[in-house]
């Protein structure tokens, strides 16, 4: 839901933190209760540019600064497969105009087995080794990301 809110309302939010989510637009459907197995299982693969087009179309003409974003995903998630983290990375680096390669990688960050890929001060992605869809939220990490520490 964080991906959807930040993609749809970039003028309302300053930052977001998505845990075990999917890229904005991945679950696009007919507007009713939609579950997309192709999205959930990581079979919807797009380029960063394609994802950016989807986000941009949610708020045509938006000229302001997009919210900063952090995403987390477990490598053992069988509800929303780990490929979805890669799609979120492609999406938000493109939307925020960041390089698609991290500027640094932090191993055992936040927890043992968690690797955080930092793409600048506006986007980071964390992969949690062996963690399922029930990924443990780290409130302090989120508050720090929001600058509320």
Please describe what each predicted stretch is.
Residues 3, 7, 83-86, 90, ...:
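Solvent-exposed, polar/charged alpha-helical surfaces in well-ordered, non-transmembrane soluble domains
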Residues 123-129, 134-149:
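Catalytic active-site module of serine/aspartate enzymes centered on a nucleophile-bearing elbow/loop
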Residues 1-11, 17-20:
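Short glycine-enriched nucleophile-adjacent loop
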Residues 19, 105-106:
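Residue-level "edge-of-site" marker
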Residues 10, 93, 97, 147:
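Hydrophobic/aromatic-lined pockets within catalytic cores
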Residues 23-96, 101, 109-121, 129-133:
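The feature captures the conserved acid-bearing segment of alpha/beta-hydrolase catalytic domains
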């Amino acid at each position: 839901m964080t991906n959807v809110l930040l993609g749809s309302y970039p003028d309302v939010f300053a930052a977001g933190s998505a845990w075990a989510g999917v890229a904005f637009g991945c679950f696009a459907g007919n507007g009713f209760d939609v579950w997309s197995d192709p999205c959930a299982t990581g079979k919807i693969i797009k380029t960063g540019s394609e994802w950016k087009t989807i986000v941009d179309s949610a708020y045509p003409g938006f000229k302001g600064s997009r919210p900063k974003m952090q995403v987390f995903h477990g490598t053992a998630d069988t509800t929303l497969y780990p490929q979805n983290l890669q799609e979120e990375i492609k999406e938000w680096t493109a939307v925020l105009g960041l390089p698609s390669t991290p500027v640094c990688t932090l191993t055992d960050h936040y927890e043992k087995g968690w690797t955080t890929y930092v793409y600048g001060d506006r986007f980071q992605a964390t992969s949690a080794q062996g963690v399922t869809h029930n990924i443990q939220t780290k409130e302090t990490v989120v508050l720090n990301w929001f600058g509320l520490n």
